[in-house]
């Protein structure tokens, strides 16, 4: 009886942590790849964008070009960073999903040949600041 109880307790202790984290993606995942067209890559530009997530929750970042067409998206866990490489040379708009809301950065960034750019999410986007709220439809348009 003691062996069965010990086995059950050990089993529960091993299963619970995996269940808690099983629904959470990994940084770099393409969680909405079925809702967007293929990623836009430019292997000759050598341009990159490092995205740092310093807020207390995970985010999904979406990059759009100067015509607001889809370029790339990525899932980033809180406290982590991810670098998007081989970006096209263009002006970019940064949109993101934070908790259950969708936002866009008010600033337009320029990606030039060979540049290494950095974008940092430094506080909760639902607070007033450099972001404005967008609809789910705007976020998921191709």
Predicted regions and their residues:
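A short, solvent-exposed beta-strand micro-motif common in secreted/extracellular proteins
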Residues: 90-100
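Bacterial N-terminal signal peptides that target proteins for export
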Residues: 1-9
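Short beta-strand segments within Ig-like beta-sandwich modules, predominantly Fibronectin type-III
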Residues: 72-76
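Primarily secretory-pathway and cell-envelope proteins
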Residues: 23-67, 98-142
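Short Pro-Gly-centered beta-turn/loop motif in secreted/extracellular proteins
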Residues: 83-91
């Amino acid at each position: 009886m003691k062996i069965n109880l010990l086995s059950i307790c050990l089993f529960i202790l091993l299963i619970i942590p995996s269940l808690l984290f099983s629904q959470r993606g990994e940084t770099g995942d393409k969680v909405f790849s079925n809702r967007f067209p293929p990623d836009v890559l430019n292997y000759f530009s050598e341009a990159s964008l490092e995205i740092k997530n310093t807020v207390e929750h995970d985010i999904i970042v979406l990059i759009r070009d100067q015509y607001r067409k889809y370029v790339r998206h990525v899932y980033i866990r809180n406290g982590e960073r991810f670098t998007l490489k081989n970006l096209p040379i263009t002006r970019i708009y940064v949109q993101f999903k934070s908790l259950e809301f969708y936002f866009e950065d008010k600033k337009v960034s320029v990606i030039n040949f060979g540049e290494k750019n950095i974008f940092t999410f430094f506080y909760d986007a639902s607070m007033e600041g450099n972001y404005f709220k967008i609809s789910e439809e705007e976020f998921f348009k191709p």
